């Protein structure tokens, strides 16, 4: 695999950088309604210092769905958007590998290569911003930190320890000038390394973080965005046939609502009918059988809370179609349901 990826993308050093920051979204053409939803929410942001948003789609430019082009046209009134596609060879390689980490690495690398600013914010496709000043706050944190990498959450797992001071990629603000001067795009890809007798699986960008002069952690309140992590990677593995998630938890049932938010209600209605049966352990999603038996009641409750938080932020209440969809979540959450029962800044009301 590394032989295929090593020279798949390249970049040049960044000279005469523009002021401000660039927001980057690595998107999937198969999830076009989610792309639409994210763009619309990004357009609601206070983006005074945003130079542009670079949207990278995982297909050649002439195959980008019309729904994405329409959303770009709609949102361009509020922010500058540049759309990039893959070359035919990049598309061939990624389709052959069908691995989420390859798609994200390639798309991020392409965007970093095209950025006109030093500051680049990696905005996950499945992270939906609620707080209108999110991007500006992330940029301020990066400026104040003076770090090459400024993240909002510590990375843990795969042999990585807290002492390494590494941060996750989602909502990560980074110095594109530093990366383009010191590294090749392939250096950002996942790496296995033996360190002090331990095998460490460095996720995307972690190995170059380890070599940086300074990285910083600036946490933000979870209420500023709705981010059911790994939705895109889970969807890639599911569609590729690598898993049906039997006996495993997942966030794929956030997708029907995300599609609804992006103007496609068909999946929401289809899954709503399938969730009517409380004890049903599989459903049909994206043409494949998906197991739900590994989702714990507490996680059904958490997903309901995230959907309602986003729905209330967008329209002020839960629309009837969404409330009907969430009925299946409520049945499965049982006594673990938190909506309407909590108090405090992270509480979500039952409306």
List the model feature ranges, each with a label.
Residues 267-351:
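Terminal low-complexity segments of carbohydrate-biosynthetic enzymes
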Residues 63-114:
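Active-site-proximal specificity loops/subdomain of glycosyltransferases
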Residues 124-128:
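The conserved acidic donor/metal-binding loop of glycosyltransferases
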Residues 21-31, 45, 56-58:
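A conserved hydrophobic helix/loop-capping motif in glycosyltransferases and polysaccharide synthases
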């Amino acid at each position: 695999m590394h032989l295929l990826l090593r020279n798949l993308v390249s970049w040049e050093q960044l000279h005469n950088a523009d002021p401000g920051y660039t927001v980057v979204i690595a998107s999937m053409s198969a999830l076009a309604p989610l792309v639409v939803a994210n763009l619309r929410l990004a357009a609601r942001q206070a983006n005074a210092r945003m130079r542009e948003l670079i949207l990278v789609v995982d297909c050649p430019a002439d195959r980008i769905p019309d729904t994405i082009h329409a959303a770009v046209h709609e949102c361009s009134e509020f922010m500058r958007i540049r759309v990039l596609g893959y070359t035919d060879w990049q598309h061939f390689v990624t389709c052959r590998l069908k691995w989420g980490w390859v798609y994200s690495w390639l798309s991020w690398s392409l965007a970093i290569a095209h950025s006109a600013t030093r500051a680049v914010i990696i905005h996950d496709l499945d992270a939906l911003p609620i707080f209108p000043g999110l991007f500006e706050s992330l940029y301020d944190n990066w400026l104040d930190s003076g770090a090459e990498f400024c993240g909002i959450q510590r990375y843990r797992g795969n042999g990585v320890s807290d002492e390494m001071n590494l941060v996750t990629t989602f909502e990560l603000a980074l110095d594109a000038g530093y990366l383009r001067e010191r590294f090749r795009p392939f250096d950002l890809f996942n790496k296995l390394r033996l360190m002090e007798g331990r095998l460490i699986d460095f996720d995307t960008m972690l190995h170059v973080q380890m070599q940086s002069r300074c990285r910083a952690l600036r946490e933000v309140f979870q209420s500023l965005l709705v981010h059911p992590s790994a939705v895109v990677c889970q969807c890639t593995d599911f569609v590729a046939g690598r898993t049906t998630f039997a006996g495993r938890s997942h966030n794929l049932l956030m997708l029907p609502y995300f599609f609804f938010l992006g103007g496609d209600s068909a999946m929401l209605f289809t899954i709503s009918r399938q969730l009517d049966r409380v004890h049903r352990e599989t459903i049909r999603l994206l043409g494949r059988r998906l197991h739900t038996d590994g989702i714990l009641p507490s996680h059904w409750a958490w997903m309901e809370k995230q959907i309602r938080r986003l729905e209330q932020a967008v329209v002020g209440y839960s629309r009837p179609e969404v409330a009907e969809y969430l009925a299946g979540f409520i049945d499965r959450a049982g006594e673990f349901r938190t909506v309407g029962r909590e108090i405090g800044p992270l509480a979500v009301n039952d409306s």
